[in-house]
Amino acid sequence: DAVILREHIHDVFRKAARETNLEEKRRLLTFHIVGAGFTGVEMAGELAEYVPILCDRYEVDRKDVSIYNVDILERTVPFLPEKLSNKVEKRLKKMGVTLMLSTNVSKMGKGFIEIQSKDEDKTVHQKTGTVIWAAGIESSNITQKAAEILPSENRGRIKVDDYLRSLEHKDVFVIGDNMYYIPEGEKTPVPQMVENCEQSAAVAAKNIAYAITNSGEMIKYKPSFHGVMVSIGGRYGVARVGLPNLMFNLPSFLAMLSKHFINIFYFVQVLGWNKIFSYVKHEFLTIRNCRSFVGGHFSNRNPSFLLVPLRIWLGAVWTYVNTLDTKS
């Protein structure tokens, strides 16, 4: 899907470069990203960061490109604290993304999208070249079929009890993105993210073993998440990490650093150390367009950070020489 989307984006820029009608050119270069959750804002950030490069390559005026991020909710990434959501919104606006929050998509088709603000009854018809749907996660096909029989919520997520069993069929266990479970004392269901998948899988495996062998005892699912991280392009991110009862926000540099640490941690488990070296080379040493939270300073094509000790030494020598000249 990512490759198809990338080729589509290049294709609309190629068409726009040849288009002589300004109105049609701007339609081709209009992007609507529906959904301002984790996927939506990350997509908007990546696209906004990629647009200047595409404009240079295809000789397109940046002013003709429009990126809209649409969501029915009042703020971006509502799973984050409001302070971090505000940072995300500020960064997206700085990158040229137009936020359309509290806005519902009522209809869309080839070359257009119709949106309606919750504060107004008027429906706005906008021309567009691309609509990217990032408004929520759909359950897998097999889960969707199961949801026709089993109690479910939110796009086919199956309701489960404390032991991750279906509410009506105790021999059916559901985990990860496919389950709908609200922990005790919480008001919202567990998020559809990696930590929830891993932790629920471990609990379900033990409970299935108990159901088969009838030895030991069932384990209640008590999720303990260590935080979330959102990257807005390759140079900026926000994160909230810590322990369940002690969470804190990280500044952008540390947030991006934690992102790479997490990626490396999972690569070691899945692909081994060889992949780590490839990842480090790609993300820190071969950096194109300064697309990294360390800028281009670590690039092997321009390793300017290696010059820092030399510059410090040279500055110290000049200071020492000037001091001697002053004394003489």
Language-model features, listed with the residues they occupy:
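Short glycine-rich anion-binding loops that position phosphate/pyrophosphate groups of nucleotides
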Residues: 44, 137-139, 235
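FAD-site-proximal beta/loop scaffold in flavoenzymes
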Residues: 1-21, 112, 125-199
